[in-house]
Amino acid sequence: MMYTKLIFKNAKRSGKDYLIYIVTMTLCVTLFYAFLSISSTHYHPTIGAEYNISLLAGGMKLAICGISLLLLFLIHYVNRFMLRKKQSEFAVEATLGMEQKTIGLLFFGETFFLLIFSVSVGILLGMVVSQVITAMLLASFGEPYAFSWSFFPDTVLLTVGFFVVCQILVGVGNVRILNKSRIIELMTANRQNEKPLHKSRWMPMICIFYGIMLLWMLEVGAVKYHFYFDPRHPLPVKLMYWGNVLFPALTLLWAIAGAVLHRKIGFSRYLCGLLAGAVLTAIPIFSIAELEKAYFLGFDAPTLNQYLLFGVADILFIISAVMYLSNAALLYWKESKVSRKYHNTSLFLFGQLSSKLATNTKTMTIICVTLTFSICLFVIAPVLTGWSLGYLDSRAVYDIQISSRYNDVYEVENLPDTDYEEITAFIEQNNIEIKDDLTFSEYLPQKSDFYQRVKYDFPPLAIALKDYNAVRKMLGYEPIILKTDEFATHWHSAAEDKDIENYIAEHTLLETDAGTLKLSENAVFQEPVGESIYNLYTDVVYIIPDEIAQVLLPVQSNRFVMTQYPLPFKTAEMLEQLLGRSYPEDPDKDNLAGYSTTVRTTEVNRIIALNFILKASLIYGAIVLMVMCLAVLALQQLLDAEKNNYRFSVLRKMGVEEKDLHTLVLKQLGVWFGMPITAAIVVAMIVIGYFLQSVSAEISAYIGCGALMRQIGIIVGIFALLMSCYFLSTWLLFQRSIRSNSDSVR
């Protein structure tokens, strides 16, 4: 009972010191409960019969719990911070005769009590935030949102259980640490000095690993140059091949020369050379994706993934080098001019910054990398999900659609000739009301094209004018008109205007087995009509007169059905299973056609569920990583404040005003918060800019620049809010720490 009272007393007395811990854990619990609430068995949002929410419950629970394991590191770090902060207090208690095991258990009880408080508040806030998640989910299904206060017992139990288990695991470790610690170590822990920056092994080890990566880059670049380089390549492709060999080679030579002559060169100059080489090496690496898209270089997926790995290694090294050189530049700037060092309280500020330079440099590098990754996740999440949902609108255009594929059929006699009577029987059996039903074929302009099987060189298909106009009528578009000797084109919605213009300029005539057709004056159409009408690796379909189509070879059979009302989910699932059995995508026997089938209800459910899981997981992971970074930055500064508060009391005794002390604190926090955050924002902007440029066509076709900018604005607001909260909390606690110490000294 006495120990219980002591736990509550210590927790109450140290509440302000633990503000960062309480805020961080409350925020994590809030997010955990809010995102996990939609996986509850008691969660039943109001959606139509064509939707099934159970598809995403299991995946959501697995994804959120998996990402939440990162919080174990955060809980461990925060507990270690509190342990270090109270080491001198523990030493006094041990000196007075209290057993170290008892001290450890009291500390565990104190942190456990604070965790329970944070979990309780977090769950209450999570009930509110879960409404935002529900609104996101209903918006994904196209349903209106209405506020409804909900309580999910299974989610509460899972939330409490997860965080309690994490705290127990960390708490047991803390008790063991205290049991093994000597009293003298606890007393003198705050007085230990660290190695200066130039003696830190952190950056030399990174340089060694980067040198190994450079050797690998050089080997891969030389192999690709030997097997893929062609003098007929355009200049940008040649520069890419040359750069992937030359820049890694030069950077590797500098790395070897610098390692041999490091005493003459100096580590900072050596690192500057490596940094310049890393930047140059990254340019051809990141150009590969764009060049592959523009010129079809033929790189396979393992090669592209390999270069992606090289690009990530370059970015990580650049961040590490920039962080190290920034801190080295701080020392150089201090020593370069005596008047600068001794101006006002600058000497004290430089002493504060340089006292933890080695440790803070390593921490800031890790934080910068993690924060960069977090920002990229934030921006990439809406792009990927918006792209997928926009693509869904182009893919699942019809309620029921099925198309054959001739690409695995090697004899004309084996081409399918079917009207898909199983669909007709299913419709009649289930009394499904039909709005439109169209069965038609697509053709090859020339029969000889049937034997063209080069992967990226399949010929475009052709569709008869009456069938094309019937498709347009189903989708609410106006019909088109062609003369008997003309043809037109229909393009994929993601095709770029430049590519369309170039293709049209080169294909003003179309050679067919029934004669030559000329391009119509109104020759380009690009409304979404589904994915299945295009041949593999093509973005265009020829529209030809009906008389011409009757002469050509039909190679693809399609059936598109529009129902009067959306299919219920169970009915759609039965139909999908029937089509999968009757018309397999990959038949067991060779030389038989495969089929592409899409039932809109099941496809929409599947894609929306997967997209929501992806979007929620990326956003949740990004927020968790961001909270971890900001919490570590804040706790590191508060720990330094605890160790160095005597210095501030000396300044007060020397007559330094409170206003100047506040300025000193702001400058110190500005450096340690500003450097990693600024570097992360700059690197993230470069990476995100490259990513957005590479998918600009998809963004324009499926998302829209306005919608993307609104989402990015929300992301910037969340980041600014989190950063402001942590910076302000750290500044207030830092001020309190140095003020309370000054009062105790007096």
Predicted regions and their residues:
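Short cytosolic juxtamembrane segments of multi-pass membrane proteins
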Residues: 1-5, 181-197, 643, 736-746
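Interfacial "coupling" helices/loops that link adjacent transmembrane helices in transporter permeases
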Residues: 6-17, 73-113, 190-197, 631-670
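Small-residue-rich transmembrane alpha-helices
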Residues: 30-41, 77-81, 113-143, 155-180, ...
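Conserved transmembrane alpha-helices of multi-pass membrane proteins
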Residues: 52-69, 141-169, 196-209, 235-249, ...
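Nucleotide-cofactor and metal-assisted catalytic machinery
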Residues: 392-612
